[in-house]
Amino acid sequence: MALLKSFIDVGSDSHFPIQNLPYGVFKPESNSTPRPAVAIGDLVLDLSAISEAGLFDGLILKDADCFLQPNLNKFLAMGRPAWKEARSTLQRILSSNEPILRDNDVLRRKSFHQMSKVEMIVPMVIGDYTDFFASMHHAKNCGLMFRGPENAINPNWFRLPIAYHGRASSIVISGTDIIRPRGQGHPQGNSEPYFGPSKKLDFELEMAAVVGPGNELGKPIDVNNAADHIFGLLLMNDWSARDIQAWEYVPLGPFLGKSFGTTISPWIVTLDALEPFGCQAPKQDPPPLPYLAEKESVNYDISLEVQLKPSGRDDSCVITKSNFQNLYWTITQQLAHHTVNGCNLRPGDLLGTGTISGPEPDSYGCLLELTWNGQKPLSLNGTTQTFLEDGDQVTFSGVCKGDGYNVGFGTCTGKIVPSPP
């Protein structure tokens, strides 16, 4: 089959060819109304302009106003038939042999914007955010550090996707500075706890699923139908203050050590775009209980990378590489488990995967693991470092390598700035 091509010039190394078309929300000017968009090459396609021109002419979307909203929530709520229709329409009107947009100079000028000149914002209203703990390698490494080899992974971990409820209000878009959090820490021994800026600030390499239609209160989602409730994935950095977290987490789990900031990438890559990169998820032993047993257990071959640009330096260092395949619990199992007690999910809710660590030290997904809680400093082109310092910039990237094209997520970037005096 010939590779689908667009009339938009897209470089071979671009994350955003016509095979991808990820969704986001942008503002052409800082004071303009937000509008939904898809990315293609170096351009942003304004979906409100496409909608107003009547180009969404399918049965579901022809009279819909979902792309005239300032966020994606209404579109997310419409479900997979609408998502598939939108994708089909967009691929058709952007294809190289379709004149309806290609040859309409007025509409092209109205619809396309240079990505480098627009402001991207959080693309949906996030009512709730839950963070899972789905990588076995990450769970094992944390257990080895804090509990020892005898109890590295708690028995319940292999039985259910562990999670905690995060703070939706502090989720920010890529490029937003992160203020070093303040809180209580506790030194070794019997010393009194201290209060002040975190001394062990860390990143966590994660991805997150964006919830689509969701479910009514009291009506769980079957694990084999869960994919129809996941619109797509994005990159996520769940910034973590390890010293605050270690002192506070017993007995109820993370609080101030996590709630100060979570960064997401601006573009949501749909499950339809990821479908060619689906792969078998790890075999689960013991077998999951029936409500978590999937007919097909799918992960995705998404290569992930973290770059650290130390404060005052012009160069960045690649400090780890991992892959979405390293998740033990699938995103569909995570969603099904979340709802099995009757909990209702809503359009735009965010489900984080937890840190995606691989089996080898160069694939660990956070500094806690990479430096083994500060005991093994990281080498950075002639200098060493344990945790994040003020001025450090962390950038995630993720991409699927296709045959002649990429399906990528762009980047997820944040810089650490000092705590206020």
UniProtKB/Swiss-Prot annotation:
It catalyses: 4-fumarylacetoacetate + H2O = acetoacetate + fumarate + H(+). One of its GO terms (biological process) is homogentisate catabolic process. Mg(2+) binds at residues 238, 258, 262. Ca(2+) binds at residues 131, 204, 206, 238. Keywords: Calcium, Hydrolase, Magnesium, Metal-binding, Phenylalanine catabolism, Tyrosine catabolism. Converts fumarylacetoacetate to acetoacetate and fumarate. Involved in tyrosine catabolic pathway. Catalyzes the final step in the tyrosine degradation pathway. Substrate binds at residues 147, 245, 249, 355. The active site is at 138 (proton acceptor). Its cofactor is Ca(2+); Mg(2+). Pfam families: FAA_hydrolase, FAA_hydrolase_N. Disruption phenotype: Spontaneous cell death phenotype under short-day conditions. This is Fumarylacetoacetase. Belongs to the FAH family. Gene3D superfamilies: Fumarylacetoacetase, N-terminal domain (2.30.30.230), Fumarylacetoacetase-like, C-terminal domain (3.90.850.10). Disulfide bonds: none annotated. SUPFAM superfamilies: FAH, Fumarylacetoacetate hydrolase, FAH, N-terminal domain. It is an enzyme of class 3 (hydrolase). Its EC number is 3.7.1.2. GO terms for molecular function: fumarylacetoacetase activity; metal ion binding. PANTHER family: FUMARYLACETOACETASE. Pathway: Amino-acid degradation; L-phenylalanine degradation; acetoacetate and fumarate from L-phenylalanine: step 6/6. The keyword Magnesium applies. It comes from the Eukaryota.
